[in-house]
Regions:
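Bacterial N-terminal signal peptides
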Residues: 4-15
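Acidic, glycine/proline-rich Ca2+-coordinating loop motifs
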Residues: 16-166
Length: 166
């Protein structure tokens, strides 16, 4: 009886799953981020680890924006490119790169991020963990951030892999 129930559930799952088709709409909607892990042939441990993403309403317009963590050049890296974390502003389902305007284009080897209103001013702040110095961005409430890492004592010069606000 148990075996026939499991087979029945699995067949329903396959029948239902056949109707789903996923299309990559990221380019059409303006999300053009591609993560680069450093790409050396040295097989550094850090190259095997992915990076974080934050869903953050940084501009208080009641829709979620996206902050992507990016890799960074490692020793013996032969690419001639500048990598930085990216912030994409959600504008009714169309995404605009707001990294430069917001001032959150950290160029360290970022691993993770967390967002929360740390200073209770109604604006969501952003913490980025890095292979190297972590960064804390205070949201200024006008679409921009200020790096206040030193002022708040965010002193982790080694390797921060993840973070969370409670």
């Amino acid at each position: 009886m148990l075996r026939s129930s499991i087979i029945y559930i699995l067949s329903i799952t396959f029948v239902v799953a056949e109707g789903f088709i996923f299309n990559d709409e990221s380019d059409a909607q303006g999300v053009t981020f591609v993560h680069d892990h450093g790409g050396t042939d040295q097989r550094y441990y850090i190259e095997t680890i992915g990076a974080g993403v934050c869903l953050i309403d940084y501009d208080n317009d009641n829709d979620l924006d996206i902050y992507f963590c990016q890799g960074s050049p490692l020793p013996r890296w032969d690419k001639d490119v500048i990598l930085e974390n990216k912030l994409f502003r959600n504008d009714n389902g169309q995404w605009k790169d707001a990294t430069s305007l917001a001032g959150v284009g950290d160029r360290s080897y970022s691993m993770g991020c967390a967002c929360g209103d740390v200073d209770n001013d109604g604006d969501v702040d952003l913490y980025v963990t890095n292979y190297g110095q972590d960064v804390f961005y205070r949201n200024d409430g006008d679409g921009t951030f200020t790096d206040v890492s030193k002022e708040v004592g965010a002193n982790n010069p080694l390797w921060g892999a993840s973070s969370a606000f409670f």
